[in-house]
């Protein structure tokens, strides 16, 4: 029996709806059970109406606080263990880093890392920009 589960990990729901909802719909049409772990703002009804299983996750889009990131990592590991997906699709830098670590801990071998959202890195003149 094959495990036809995909889990998307994205830092905020509106970004997923804007950039990855079409991919999720196609996977559902192919018979996959599709999950989304994300920070929920105002897109939950669109996500659920599409047929995705939504897992609320608090993840800041910026910042490098160790304790906050550690709490987020633990929450991601719990979701990965609960869902046990065949494939995780990690979108944007923070989900790629934390989701990649969580995938190692949970022995998920199917990992897609989609780097996007780098435009803001060119707007800041501080330590995190340029």
PLM regions and their residue ranges:
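Extreme N-terminal starter segment of soluble prokaryotic enzymes
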Residues: 2-6
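N-terminal strand-loop element at the rim of the active site
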Residues: 9-68
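A short, histidine- and acid-enriched strand-loop-helix "catalytic/donor-clamping" loop
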Residues: 10-17, 61-64, 105-129
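Helix C-cap/helix->beta junction micro-motif
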Residues: 30, 50, 83, 106-107
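Short beta-strand scaffold positions
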Residues: 38, 89-90
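An amphipathic, basic-hydrophobic alpha-helix
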Residues: 59-87, 97-105, 130
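Short His-centered aromatic/hydrophobic patch
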Residues: 90-96, 115
């Amino acid at each position: 029996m094959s495990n036809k589960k995909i889990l998307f990990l994205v830092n905020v729901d509106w970004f997923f709806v804007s950039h990855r909802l079409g991919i999720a719909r196609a996977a559902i049409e192919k018979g996959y059970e599709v999950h989304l772990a994300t920070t929920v703002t105002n897109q939950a009804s669109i996500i659920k109406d599409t047929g995705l299983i939504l897992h609320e996750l608090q993840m800041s889009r910026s910042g490098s606080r160790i304790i906050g990131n550690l709490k987020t990592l633990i929450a991601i590991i719990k979701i990965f263990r609960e869902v046990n997906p065949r494939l995780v699709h990690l979108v944007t830098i923070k989900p790629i880093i934390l989701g990649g670590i969580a995938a190692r801990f949970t022995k998920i071998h199917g990992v897609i890392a989609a780097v996007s959202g780098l435009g803001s890195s060119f707007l800041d003149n501080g330590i995190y920009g340029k």
